[in-house]
Amino acid sequence: MRIIFLLIALICAGLVSYALYLQLADGLLPCPLCIFQRMAYWLVGITALFAFIHHPQRLGRRIYCGLIILFSLAGAIVAGRQAWLVRFPEAFECGISPEEAFLNELPLARWWPDMFEANGDCTDGTWQFLSLTIPDWSLLIFLAFSLIAGLLWRSRSISSSNLK
């Protein structure tokens, strides 16, 4: 069970690293919704890493899984919104969004602008893999994290089943 938390943390680190690669090497600028998703990946990954290090019993595991579900569903909502905007760009208002102004004023954006500064277009769907855009993949991954955390939340640990 512990290894699953480590895998989630490593997947999150890989996804955030790949997002930085797309930004810095390919010039794909992140929009405000992309930054919110990055933050959600950070929160899911750090929570999973803490769960791996802590190796909690049932109550602690449920707390960690609950946080992963919460952060993953928040990320899924944002990714779903962006996936919708990519398909229906006419629904997006031009100009600087309140989210962009808010994000760019956060201390994180000043401390690490490459990671947390938003200056891209939320309707940009140019990058695709297997006919799915980045927000589509992000939505699927966040939902998968929620499902996995839900299954871990419900599961019994091997040690507790041996005690009965």
Curated annotation (Swiss-Prot):
Cytoplasmic side, ranges: 1-4, 57-62, 156-164
Transmembrane segments: 5-21, 40-56, 63-80, 137-155
Positions in the Periplasmic compartment: 22-39, 81-136
Pfam families from the UniProt entry: DsbB
Main subcellular location of this protein, as a coarse class: membrane
Gene Ontology cellular-component terms listed: plasma membrane
Alphabetical keyword list: Cell inner membrane, Cell membrane, Chaperone, Disulfide bond, Electron transport, Membrane, Oxidoreductase, Redox-active center, Transmembrane, Transmembrane helix, Transport
Superkingdom, taxonomy of origin: Bacteria
Membrane topology: Multi-pass membrane protein
Alphabetized GO MF terms: electron transfer activity; protein-disulfide reductase activity
GO BP terms, alphabetized: protein folding
Coiled-coil annotated spans: none
Function: Required for disulfide bond formation in some periplasmic proteins. Acts by oxidizing the DsbA protein.
Protein name: Disulfide bond formation protein B
Source species of the chain: Nitrosomonas europaea (strain ATCC 19718 / CIP 103999 / KCTC 2705 / NBRC 14298)
Taxonomic lineage from the root: Bacteria, Pseudomonadati, Pseudomonadota, Betaproteobacteria, Nitrosomonadales
Protein's gene: dsbB
